[in-house]
Amino acid sequence: MYVLNRKGEEEDISFDQILKRIQRLSYGLHKLGEYPACVTQGVINGMYSSIKTCELDELAAQTCAYMATTHPDFSILAARITTDNLHKNTSDDVAEVAEALYTYKDGRGRPASLISKEVYDFILLHKVRLNKEIDYTTHFNYDYFGFKTLERSYLLRINNKIIERPQHLLMRVSIGIHIDDIDKALETYHLMSQKYFTHATPTLFNSGTPRPQMSSCFLLSMKADSIEGIFETLKQCALISKTAGGIGVAVQDIRGQNSYIRGTNGISNGLVPMLRVFNDTARYVDQGGGKRKGSYAVYIEPWHSDIFEFLDLRKNHGKEELRARDLFYAVWVPDLFMKRVKENKNWTLMCPNECPGLSETWGEEFEKLYTKYEEENMGKKTVLAQDLWFAILQSQIETGVPIYLYKDSCNAKPIKNLGTIKCSNLCCEIIEYTSPDEVAVCNLASIALCKFVDLEKKEFNFKKLYEITKIITRNLDKIIERNYYPVKEAKTSNTRHRPIGIGVQGLADTFMLLRYLYESDAAKELNKRIYETMYYAALEMSVDWLQSGPYESYQGSPGSQGILQFDMWNAKVDNKYWDWDELKLKIAKTGLRNLLLLAPMPTASTSQILGNNESFEPYTSNIYYRRVLSGEFFVVNPHLLKDLFDRGLWDEDMKQQLIAHNGSIQYISEIPDDLKELYKTVWEIKQKNIIDMAADRGYFIDQSQSLNIYIQKPTFAKLSSMHFYGWEKGLKTGAYYLRTQAATDAIKFTVDTHVAKNAVKLKNADGVQITREVSRETIQLNQRYSKCVSFKSNNDEQCLMCSG
């Protein structure tokens, strides 16, 4: 049997040569022992005559990836093998890579540069220093699935062949941001290379390219309630989606069904047919040749006369002509609606064509205008507020949406001097002003919190977090200048207000590394201190980075009046950790460069690249699947796997039990209680505590946060209790998605039948006990709002705060 080397020559297969290579790449890994020989044997077993050496490498990587449930270091070894293979097929000269990307021609011989001329010129000018600074050894710190994510979507290709290495990508991104400052470019490169933070996906996609559209989020309100206005807005959405932007669009100003059209003496068809056109546009414009589908979130206020039809648009049943399932839906909820639901009062549906101004007002002004229209009998229909409430909840239970945000909180706490904010973005963490002349924009980056844990001292390094946050603040501000804007209204808004959005990933990993239980007082205190540090650092940098005065719309803003985010929450923040009094004096003296700063977002792709748990969320499971082109792989929570491995508890039987219990360890008798407490999944953590932690960090988040809600078996009572609790806590985002678990488990073909049956038996037996262990506080919450759910619910339910 022989292999074909990269020159196409035949070579005899050498077991020893394969083994030596795997052993060479196993440096620094934790107690792999005899496993390299097992990997080598697995590779030999999967080989065939005339296999290419690059295919042999991929086979070795896949073998290691399958063994990752034996020990987490196998995922790193798999990535190292894949990386080593990439190194053999790509250049280690930065200028040579830039040359290939810049001089690329398409199939017809036309110039089709993949990087911009100024980036190319910059690299040629500084090639000696760049080649000296770039560190390819950091490639070997990615795990297999992080590397595969980069390989699949992020690294630039020519004729479907990967040209970039991950370090080339990070260098391209850094240069694209700091084209005028090599020192700052290299500083950013090294920090990203060391995985302290990452810029958002659109920045990784497009920085340094001929059209560097690096912004993640775009918010629009309709140009006008007319054919011209609707299709101008649709064109804006298409152009934004084309360049990888996620979209939030407010449609509450579009007239409802059967509303009179004065210009044609006709009758409106309402929102549904219009949204089907937006739906098809989202499907068609897929962000650059299939990178990812266009994504739009459509916002509406609950007084709109088409609200019931709106809530059905994503459902799986019903007439197809009344469905638009590729859009995401959101409700922009005024406090008055929540009050009416709580008091079981009527709610009037209105058409914006006949009752103008509702979307332009909030708080007391909105309530006065709304009740005035009611008194004048201007509404289209009157319903019980609770009937609409339960329609919203039913849609959330069936589809996970609508996304749920509180209009008055969103307008009261970030900015008040520009006008009424009408919507958020796709992921509901951006709170910015929009108008027909302004498309709101936000550039994002996320900090990998687990990198700030000192494992020896079991301490969190707040000083380093402060330093990194300041660097990210400067980077995101520079992107505003360097960015390519797909529509002129976006540039107008972004240069006028200069908002940015800094988020996090790996908060759950941080707690686990510090041995903090997610619901513990220590975790709650750390949660607050992290965001206080980030907010302080970002504000301070926004003061220090002033170059030509504050941002254009600064005068009249809360910041110009000495009011910061925590002041709007009426929260008392002392100078124990940071000198807020001094910072307020600096702001009063010089102003701020940026309107908004913090916006914890979902980090689905980038956290997978860096190998962290997503955003600020708990782990949803301790075992899950990862899919790549070569197949499906089990991945175990690496912290849990290391603990079980160190205690001699990890073996094939433990793996089988973990799969049988859907990633929960609460019912596995061999696992000690301290680990059961530390490795609770989100389904085993009280939602009340998750909401409390969201409110605690909310004092320091001037935009909002993508807060998912997790309920195993959602019901009206549980959802009502959760929504009202979050509303009363003052959250801006009440719920991004409602996440639920399937009513029945999928058949686990890989699990021993006896293990699976025993898992079900244990869970059912323990379920009785869990149900009884409802806190008094939770019962009181449920009783407090029983009035608004009692006539709809026939079940004796426990509150969702227990996640029972």
Curated annotation (Swiss-Prot):
A GO-annotated cellular component: ribonucleoside-diphosphate reductase complex
Domain ATP-cone, chain residue ranges per copy: 1-92
Modulation of this protein's activity: Under complex allosteric control mediated by deoxynucleoside triphosphates and ATP binding to separate specificity and activation sites on the large subunit. The type of nucleotide bound at the specificity site determines substrate preference. It seems probable that ATP makes the enzyme reduce CDP and UDP, dGTP favors ADP reduction and dTTP favors GDP reduction. Stimulated by ATP and inhibited by dATP binding to the activity site.
Active site: N425 (proton acceptor), C427 (cysteine radical intermediate), E429 (proton acceptor)
Sites annotated Important for electron transfer: Y736, Y737
GO biological process: deoxyribonucleotide biosynthetic process
SUPFAM superfamilies: PFL-like glycyl radical enzymes (SSF51998), R1 subunit of ribonucleotide reductase, N-terminal domain (SSF48168)
InterPro entries reported in the protein's UniProt record: ATP-cone_dom (IPR005144), NrdE_NrdA_C (IPR013346), RNR_lg_C (IPR000788), RNR_lsu_N (IPR013509), RNR_R1-su_N (IPR008926), Rrm1 (IPR039718)
Disulfide bonding pattern of the chain: C217-C442
Enzyme Commission number: 1.17.4.1
Sites where the protein binds dTTP: D225, S226, I227, K242, R255, R262, G263
Reaction(s) catalysed (UniProt annotation): a 2'-deoxyribonucleoside 5'-diphosphate + [thioredoxin]-disulfide + H2O = a ribonucleoside 5'-diphosphate + [thioredoxin]-dithiol
Keyword Signal: no
Gene3D superfamilies on file: 3.20.70.20
Residue positions binding ATP: N5, R6, E11, D12, I13, S14, F15, D16, Q17, T53, D57
Residues flagged as site, Interacts with thioredoxin/glutaredoxin: C799, C802
Self-association and partners: Heterodimer of a large and a small subunit.
Function: Provides the precursors necessary for DNA synthesis. Catalyzes the biosynthesis of deoxyribonucleotides from the corresponding ribonucleotides.
Family statement: Belongs to the ribonucleoside diphosphate reductase large chain family.
Protein name: Ribonucleoside-diphosphate reductase large subunit
Underlying gene: RNR1
